[in-house]
């Protein structure tokens, strides 16, 4: 019975990283790029729960690099699209994007190397940050791109 509850909880948590219709902006390429961001978050979640990997440092660095590179690519695409439609909220979007990239860039790699005992907690914190930021940004800002106020 306990295992059933545990897997149910895992399934509920897993839903947080699933790209569903509620995150769709109606702009196909943006939705596809958002799906990829969710996939990177899901990979991070899977890494957290992979008990066969003791030292996850290399994988953490790889995921951070993937996230940074793909996020920069996505933000560029999204901002170019907003420019092309003369989107009024472009400046606010650029500021939010820059703050997110700044957070990723300023992760202290030396601190990561020294955190053998805290890698699990670091990954949990990272996933929490990613999920919260991405969900709030898509629902609060990106969905407005396809429905600009008149």
Walk through the language-model features, giving the residues of each.
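Small-residue-biased structural context
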Residues: 2-150
């Amino acid at each position: 019975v306990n295992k059933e509850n545990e897997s149910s909880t895992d399934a509920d948590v897993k839903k947080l990283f699933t790209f569903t219709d509620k995150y769709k902006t109606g702009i196909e390429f943006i939705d596809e790029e958002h799906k990829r961001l969710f996939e990177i978050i899901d990979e991070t979640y899977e890494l957290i729960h992979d008990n066969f990997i003791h030292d996850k440092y290399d994988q953490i660095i790889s995921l951070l690099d993937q996230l940074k590179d793909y996020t920069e690519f996505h933000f560029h695409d999204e901002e170019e699209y907003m420019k092309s439609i003369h989107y009024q909220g472009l400046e606010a979007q650029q500021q939010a994007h820059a703050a997110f990239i700044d957070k990723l860039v300023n992760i202290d790699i030396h601190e990561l190397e020294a955190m053998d005992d805290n890698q699990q907690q670091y990954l949990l914190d990272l996933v929490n940050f990613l999920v919260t930021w991405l969900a709030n940004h898509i629902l609060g800002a990106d969905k407005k791109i396809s429905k600009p106020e008149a």
